[in-house]
């Protein structure tokens, strides 16, 4: 055996010995999410304040019927989709199946109607939309109907609004406050 082969084998054996070493102790898996906002969370209601920290908190607790995609187009979020009447004055938005709030209660169209009515009283874009709305109503538990005085082509853009006062859907009992 040549000396070179002996040295190569010894080097390979020394390098490989580290692979068999026991692993270091790993911390136990944790299920706690730590949230560190940029400011103190002084208000929990994302409709009655435009504070970014409250808006971010709102995104962790609530959801929206529509959201914008990467191309800034409104896409269904909680909604399964929508139908618009031929004259553009009646919008029916169908909720996806299996939607629940954090307390385990199912999301109903009545929650959506109350939430949107509340949001539209506070938000500037919502107020423009509300001026065109005759009625927000729940047809059944999964169908929201929005009746307009005249067509409002920006309705989905309003419902997908991602900033300032976001049209979050919350339980009816909270939205009625």
Positions of the model-derived regions?
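N-terminal lobe/hinge region of extracytoplasmic solute-binding protein
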Residues: 36-86, 117
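Surface-exposed binding/hinge segments that line
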Residues: 128-177
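Hydrophobic (often cysteine-bearing) scaffold residues that line and stabilize catalytic clefts
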Residues: 54-58, 108, 140
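Short, well-ordered beta-strand elements
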Residues: 30-39, 90-92, 145
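N-terminal export signals
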Residues: 5-25
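Pocket-flanking alpha-helical
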Residues: 42-46, 68, 100, 123-128
């Amino acid at each position: 055996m040549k000396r070179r082969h002996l040295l190569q084998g010894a080097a390979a054996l020394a390098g490989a010995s580290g692979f068999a070493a026991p692993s270091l102790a790993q911390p136990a898996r944790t299920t706690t999410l730590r949230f560190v906002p940029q400011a103190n969370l002084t208000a929990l209601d994302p409709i009655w304040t435009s504070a970014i920290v409250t808006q971010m908190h709102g995104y962790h607790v609530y959801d929206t019927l529509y959201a914008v995609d990467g191309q800034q187009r409104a896409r269904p979020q909680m909604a399964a989709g929508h139908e618009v009447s031929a004259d553009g004055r009646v919008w029916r938005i169908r909720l996806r199946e299996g939607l629940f709030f954090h307390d385990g209660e199912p999301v109903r169209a009545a929650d959506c109607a109350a939430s949107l009515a509340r949001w539209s009283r506070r938000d500037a874009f919502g107020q423009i939309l509300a001026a065109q709305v005759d009625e927000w109503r729940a047809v059944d538990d999964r169908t929201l109907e929005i009746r307009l005085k005249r067509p409002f082509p920006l309705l989905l853009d309003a419902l997908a609004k991602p900033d300032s006062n976001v049209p979050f859907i919350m339980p009816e009992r909270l939205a009625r406050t």
